UniProtKB/Swiss-Prot annotation:
Function: Involved in the biosynthesis of branched-chain amino acids (BCAA). Catalyzes an alkyl-migration followed by a ketol-acid reduction of (S)-2-acetolactate (S2AL) to yield (R)-2,3-dihydroxy-isovalerate. In the isomerase reaction, S2AL is rearranged via a Mg-dependent methyl migration to produce 3-hydroxy-3-methyl-2-ketobutyrate (HMKB). In the reductase reaction, this 2-ketoacid undergoes a metal-dependent reduction by NADPH to yield (R)-2,3-dihydroxy-isovalerate.
UniProt enzyme class: oxidoreductase
Binding site for substrate: S414
The keyword NADP appears for this protein: yes
SUPFAM superfamilies reported in the protein's UniProt record: 6-phosphogluconate dehydrogenase C-terminal domain-like (SSF48179), NAD(P)-binding Rossmann-fold domains (SSF51735)
Record family assignment: Belongs to the ketol-acid reductoisomerase family.
Chain residues that bind Mg(2+) 1: D217, E221
Residue numbers binding Mg(2+) 2: D217, E389, E393
Name of this protein: Ketol-acid reductoisomerase (NADP(+))
Length: 491
């Protein structure tokens, strides 16, 4: 199998990278009716598998779970979750032949084995669904020509997909049809019905492509969403302790600081996050972010280049074949870092304190979000896609760190995201060490002293923040998400 993207000519590559259309709510007037009365079989019962299935069943669809024989015989976690929630469970051989839509929600590294097992069992004219296009785009999986291949990709972890549905809402979602596999021209109807059944149509749906979803998703998770948070956590903790801060306090300031800061980002973009600072602190955060962007731009561009070329995917798949040696080594090393092993702080940190003493962290968020967005757009990805894969998902990832530090983040994200995170953070930490050595008092761990500011400078900085393209597209997209619940901010 060959990387699908690399088999396309330049015009086709650009067309698929740039496919992105915000769909109107009237396009979902029929809800999930196209799949009513049809058999939907989900392969895999992890966070996405279970929670999408619960939503789809509540939307009136016929949902069952196909699991490997060993998982059923040994009553593994996937079997327990499906059966405890009242779903029909069976082997591939029992359920796949009757399925009208088979949805593969297993981890990326299992996709080829799963598709190899289920494809011969699928009836003529059935559909195969994904929530991430890695197997199609990067692996280059060949699917039978009579099978329709679609994607519905919620831009949130599976738990959020369920919680927002229960509130009568949903999460922003990308949908796509694989252009090589739409023999009956029904792919979009299937994808729309599936998205509606999960509740995604209530929060905004982008019609995208497998290529655009994969390339933007990989870029976001490697850089700002996971890699920048990991690198920032390690660098900021070490800096605080080096300057005499109690390790327990330093750990809490960082662990819960990302979540608190990015909650403002979620509600009002970079503008609101920066507005939480005093005027002197805002000017300093802006200056720091510009320095960071200049330093990190080549690293962000390298990650985007390696994602576009397929270099990243081939390296990761080589590690899969080597029993995840690199991944497991990096995971173990991360668990032994000073940040991960620091004691817990029992005192309370007020919400504003996270902003006042986290000017550098805010600068890192601003720089990382803007760089990821700019680098994607420069590579042909449309602004709406770039927004979802940079700014939108950041509060959700920050929330995982608030639960159990970097360990929790790396457990919750996919192995693909975790591998990319380590590649980025292992390069970013040494890259930023000279910058960290030049920080001033008030940049981290202490509030910047109040003082006079130059009105013209403040005006220009405010204009620069608010006029960035991500702020303009973000304001539009957040208009569809006003009902999404706040992420709880810890004390």
């Amino acid at each position: 199998m060959a990387n699908y993207f690399n088999t396309l000519n330049l015009r086709q590559q650009l067309a698929q990278l740039g496919k992105c259309r915000f769909m109107g709510r009237d396009e979902f007037a029929d809800g999930a009716s196209y799949l009513q009365g049809k058999k939907v079989v989900i392969v895999g019962c992890g966070a996405q598998g279970l929670n999408q299935g619960l939503n789809m069943r509540d939307s009136g669809l016929d949902i069952s779970y196909a699991l490997r024989k060993e998982a059923i015989a040994e009553k593994r976690a996937s079997w327990r979750k499906a059966t405890e929630n009242g779903f029909k469970v069976g082997t591939y051989e029992e359920l796949i032949p009757q399925a009208d839509l088979v949805i593969n929600l297993t981890p990326d590294k299992q996709h080829s084995d799963v598709v190899r097992s289920v494809q011969p069992l699928m009836k003529d004219g059935a559909a195969l669904g994904y929530s991430h296009g890695f197997n199609i785009v990067e692996v280059g999986e060949q699917i039978r020509k009579d099978i329709t291949v679609v994607m519905v990709a919620p831009k949130c972890p599976g738990t959020e997909v369920r919680e927002e549905y229960k509130r009568g809402f949903g999460v922003p979602t990308l949908i796509a049809v694989h252009p090589e596999n739409d023999p009956k021209g029904e792919g979009m109807a299937i994808a729309k019905a599936w998205a509606a059944a999960t509740g995604g149509h209530r929060a905004g749906v982008l019609e995208s492509s497998f290529v655009a979803e994969v390339k933007s998703d990989l870029m976001g998770e490697q850089t700002i969403l996971c890699g920048m948070l990991q690198a920032g956590s390690l660098l900021c903790f070490d800096k605080l302790v080096e300057e005499g801060t109690d390790p327990a306090y330093a750990e809490k300031l960082i662990q819960f600081g990302w979540e608190t800061i990015t909650e403002a980002l979620k509600q009002g973009g970079i503008t609101l996050m920066m507005d939480r600072l005093s005027n002197p602190a805002k000017l300093r955060a802006y200056a720091l972010s510009e320095q960071l962007k200049a330093i990190m731009a080549p690293l962000f561009q390298k990650h985007m280049d390696d994602i576009i070329s397929g270099e990243f995917s081939s390296g990761m798949m080589a590690d899969w074949a080597n029993d995840d040696k690199k991944l497991l080594t990096w995971r173990e090393e991360t668990g032994k870092t000073a940040f991960e092993t620091a004691p817990q702080y029992e005192g309370k940190i007020g919400e504003q304190e996270y902003f006042d003493k986290g000017v550098l962290m805010i600068a890192m968020v601003k720089a990382g979000v803007e760089l990821a967005f700019e680098t994607m757009v420069d590579s042909g990805i449309i602004e709406e896609s770039a927004y979802y894969e940079s700014l939108h998902e950041l509060p959700l990832i920050a929330n995982t760190i608030a639960r159990k530090r970097l360990y929790e983040m790396n457990v919750v994200i996919s192995d693909t995201a975790e591998y990319g995170n380590y590649l980025f953070s292992y390069a970013c930490v040494p890259l930023l060490k000279p910058f960290m050595a030049e920080l001033q008092p008030g940049d981290l761990g202490k509030a910047i002293a109040e003082g006079s500011v130059d009105n013209a400078q403040l005006r220009d900085v405010n204009d620069a923040i608010r006029s960035h393209a991500i702020e303009k597209v973000g304001q539009k997209l957040r208009g569809y998400m006003t009902d999404m619940k706040r992420i709880a901010v810890a004390g």
